[in-house]
Amino acid sequence: MPIFSTRVLTYLRCIFRLFIGLMLLLTLVGCDFYTPSSQLEQIRQRGEIRVGTIYGSTSYYQRDDLAQGFDYELAKSYADWLGVKLTIVPVYSIAELVELLEKGKLDLAAAAIVVTPERRALFRFGPGFYQVSPKLVYRYGSPKPKDIGDLKGSIVVPAGSTGEDLLRELAKEYPGLKWSTNRDADVEELLKQVADGKIDYTVVQDTVLARTQRYYPELTEGLTLSKNQTVAWAMTKLPDDSLYASIIDFFGQRFMDGAIAKLDEKYFGHVQNFDFVDTRTFLQRAKSLLPKYQDLFKTHARMVDWRLLAAISYQESHWDPQARSYTGVRGMMMLTEPTAKAMGVKDRTHPAESIEGGARYLQHMMEKVPASVPTDEKVWFALTAYNIGYGHMMDARRLTKELGKNPDAWSDVKEVLPLLQQARWHRKVRYGYARGGEARNYVNNVRQYYQSLLWLDNEQQKAHRREELDEDDSSEPQSTERPTVIAEVVKQITLR
């Protein structure tokens, strides 16, 4: 009996071990058939994509409680294309953005990031969608720098920025080149320090400089430090290609349908041909003259922002109620007699009547713009009509179509407008010759003044909020340091 029992037990042990081994084998084999969700599938499953960006006038900012910015709008378009929610994670510097990306707290970074060899070693980049040129910036009135090796004074750039990478590379050729980095200041803060004379130089992309000059006209382009550099979205390097392939597909479609060209026109299409004297004069008058008429613009603005109406008035008359031109137009909005009569204006030199009449006429033009024109571009077509007449604006659209371009895209029509001054072309259109080049410049100027007024108004609102906070917290000690955004952002994302 004992011998039998021992044999049985041994046999049962063998069967048990065989069973366990078989189960382990089946488990391992089963693993071969299990495929984890791709990065893109994970984004769709959680219903959101986390995009890091940087506060600034080109990437991301809040205005009138609405998120705006080239990079923000492009990221929002991508999220909509994927059918998920966009979660924007804004920080103050490229260094903070890189840290979040390295820690896997972001799906991608969209912040006018220049593709460099150093960054390619760390991250994967999507397709390039525009190019920038790095500029050394100095203050108007200071000696113009002639050579990077002869710079005298302080050069300060944001830590981790393309400017820092570029200076480090240039130092190989110019050993005497010295600079410092600031982790707490972003590009626009450093530009303000240059404008205020607190530092001598900084390095920024040409697109940022062009927009910021509208607020700080003292900023002057010195040297171009490198050939054009490519801007692209950055993401963590992974074996999984799903997100990368999706981004390539998205950009391909957006290039084809003109969406990226439209965004480029919206944010950068009006910032060329900077004029120091004109910009400085405008900012001075915006502070001294505009407050006198501001309530009138707010009262009579109809289909447009009151600040746009004020910008039109400045372009027309420099806010001078008695303004008159050789063509006979008069007043704050420089109305012709027939237009004034049609809009119910009896005295063109009366500020309230002129502003109300101009607002009505602009509304009339906007209502006539064809429905096929996108809503956010109607105003530029209406302004063209305001300046040279509705018929000439429609001639420009027809000519644009004849040339194989898009008559509903302002970026295309504005390039065709100057052709209305050439006999070869104005003979072909219904209303003949028009000062199309002037009309294009007119719209560009209005857009520049409008952006400056938006900035000034935003600065005033921020100042009021700071005053309110100071009053509320006057009994508590105030910190002069900017909060460390990255720690709070990481904490918020981790707690999701």
From Swiss-Prot:
Assigned GO CC terms: cell outer membrane
Any single GO BP term: cell wall macromolecule catabolic process
Spans annotated as LT domain: 273-496
Pfam families xref list: SBP_bac_3, SLT
Database matches in InterPro entries: Lysozyme-like_dom_sf, MltF, Solute-binding_3/MltF_N, Transglyc_AS, Transglycosylase_SLT_dom_1
Catalytic activity: Exolytic cleavage of the (1->4)-beta-glycosidic linkage between N-acetylmuramic acid (MurNAc) and N-acetylglucosamine (GlcNAc) residues in peptidoglycan, from either the reducing or the non-reducing ends of the peptidoglycan chains, with concomitant formation of a 1,6-anhydrobond in the MurNAc residue
Region spans: Disordered: 464-485
Start and end residues of each stretch annotated as Non-LT domain: 32-271
Residues at the active site: 316
Lipid bilayer topology: Peripheral membrane protein
Highest taxon, organism lineage: Bacteria
Keywords, in A-Z order: Cell outer membrane, Cell wall biogenesis/degradation, Lyase, Membrane, Signal
Stretch forming the signal peptide: 1-31
Places the protein is found: Cell outer membrane
Keyword Zinc: no
EC number: 4.2.2.n1
GO molecular function: peptidoglycan lytic transglycosylase activity
Main location: membrane
Cross-referenced NCBIfam families: PRK10859.1
Function, as annotated: Murein-degrading enzyme that degrades murein glycan strands and insoluble, high-molecular weight murein sacculi, with the concomitant formation of a 1,6-anhydromuramoyl product. Lytic transglycosylases (LTs) play an integral role in the metabolism of the peptidoglycan (PG) sacculus. Their lytic action creates space within the PG sacculus to allow for its expansion as well as for the insertion of various structures such as secretion systems and flagella.
Name assigned to this protein: Membrane-bound lytic murein transglycosylase F
Name of the encoding gene: mltF
